[in-house]
C-alpha cells in the first residue's frame, strides 16, 4: 500500500522550518510521502549553512526565486518566498495531488513587508476557500479552538455576539466531531453572575443554547471559568475547549503541552496542520530546533485524511 502524500510548505527560510524538515525526513518518510515546496538552490544554501546533507529522496516542488538566506532576520524576500511556498502547496493539495497540507512557521512581519494581505496561514486559507476557517491548537490531552485568533484584545468584546458564535460552535462540532466541548467565559470568573462585566457571558449562554438546539444534543457547556478550566481535575471532565481570545486559550495550553501541540485548520475542504510554534529566529540555523511538534502535525494530518 502506498503512503499518503503530504505537501509541506517550508515557512520562513530565515527561521527553523527547513532545519526541522531536514532533521525529520528520515522519520516521517516511513509514514508518508513528503514533498517540500522549495527550490533546489535555496534548499542547498540552507543545508550548507546547517552543515546538513540533503537526503537523496528529499522530493521537492520547485517554486520561488533564490536569495541570500539571513538566519534569524525579518526579510521582505523571505516573507514573499514563504507565501509562494504556501500558495503552491495549497494548490497542490486542492488539486488532489496530496492528501494533506502541513505548514512550517511563517513570520507575520515578513509577510507584511512582502505585501502579503493576510495575518497568517489560517486567515489566508479562510479567504482562499471562502470559508470561516477555525484555528484549533493542542494535542490529544487538550485541544483549544479560538473564536477570535489574531485580533487585538480591544476588539474582541464586540465580536462576541450570540448569532455568530453559535454558527462558529456548530461549525466547530461538525468539523471536529468532539462530543463534549467547554466554552470559556470572557471576563474574570466568567463574570461571576454579572458582578464583573457580564454582557459577553450573556451572548455566550445564548450561543451555547442555540448551538445545542441546532445539533439536538448537549455538546457545549459553559461559560466555564477560564482560570479553573485548565486544572487537572477540570480537564478530566472536559479537555476540548473554545476560547473567546487567543492568549486566554493558548497561554495555558503551551504551558502544559508546548512540545507536542500542533495547529489544525478546521472547516476547510482540505486537511491542514502545522507546528504550534513560530520561526524561532533566536535559534535559527544553530542546530537546536526541536522536531516533536512537526512530527505530531504530520501524524495528525494523516489521521484526518483517513488514508
Curated annotation (Swiss-Prot):
Gene: pdxA
Keyword Cytoplasm carried by entry: yes
Example of a GO MF term: magnesium ion binding
Keywords on record: Cobalt, Cytoplasm, Magnesium, Metal-binding, NAD, NADP, Oxidoreductase, Pyridoxine biosynthesis, Zinc
Protein name, as recorded: 4-hydroxythreonine-4-phosphate dehydrogenase
Catalysed reactions, semicolon-separated: 4-(phosphooxy)-L-threonine + NAD(+) = 3-amino-2-oxopropyl phosphate + CO2 + NADH
Role summary: Catalyzes the NAD(P)-dependent oxidation of 4-(phosphooxy)-L-threonine (HTP) into 2-amino-3-oxo-4-(phosphooxy)butyric acid which spontaneously decarboxylates to form 3-amino-2-oxopropyl phosphate (AHAP).
HAMAP family, per the entry: PdxA_Epsilonprot
InterPro entries: PdxA_epsilonprot, PdxA_fam
SUPFAM superfamilies: Isocitrate/Isopropylmalate dehydrogenase-like
Oxidoreductase listed as a keyword: yes
NCBIfam families with a match to the protein in the record: pdxA, PRK03946.1
A GO-annotated cellular component: cytoplasm
The family this protein is said to belong to: Belongs to the PdxA family.
GO biological process, one term: pyridoxine biosynthetic process
Subunit (UniProt): Homodimer.
Main EC class the enzyme belongs to: oxidoreductase
Binding site for a divalent metal cation: 150, 189, 246
Cofactor: Zn(2+); Mg(2+); Co(2+)
Subcellular compartments: Cytoplasm
Misc. remarks from the entry: The active site is located at the dimer interface.
Functional pathway: Cofactor biosynthesis; pyridoxine 5'-phosphate biosynthesis; pyridoxine 5'-phosphate from D-erythrose 4-phosphate: step 4/5
Entry-linked Pfam families: PdxA (PF04166)
Annotated positions binding substrate: 121-122, 254, 263, 272
